């Protein structure tokens, strides 16, 4: 999004979402920045490509940044899984970006939580990620979240398309 000669901002989505999670922000930021919204393997349009690891994803994004952004970003942002990838990128190259925003990410390994999450998705994934569950979640959003956090219609369509395709491994 935006002119690729402007300062680069990369926004990395969390697990279960895709680039569209940052669509509203990208449209606003693109007036002054080149906004990059990668889709992680196993998500969105990349749902058929297995997500392997944070490290492999960091390798892929680092290559992209080297090839298309001169090896440097103005800002690097990530939420949840995206934030963990941001931390991995910054561990490898601390001067990769001028600004970093990390939200809702684990800062140190939590193997018990990981096992619990894997088991929960394995046991209840069909209840959490089915089209019916996604429609129900979208109906609850306006009731549970501040109005500005609820997905607009355009993003709801992406959500309904992509969430049921999310691999449950």
For each predicted feature, which ranges?
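Conserved HGGG/HGGXW glycine-rich cap/lid loop of the alpha/beta-hydrolase fold
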Residues: 1-47
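Structural signature of beta-strand start/N-cap positions in the alpha/beta core
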Residues: 8, 34, 73-75, 98-99
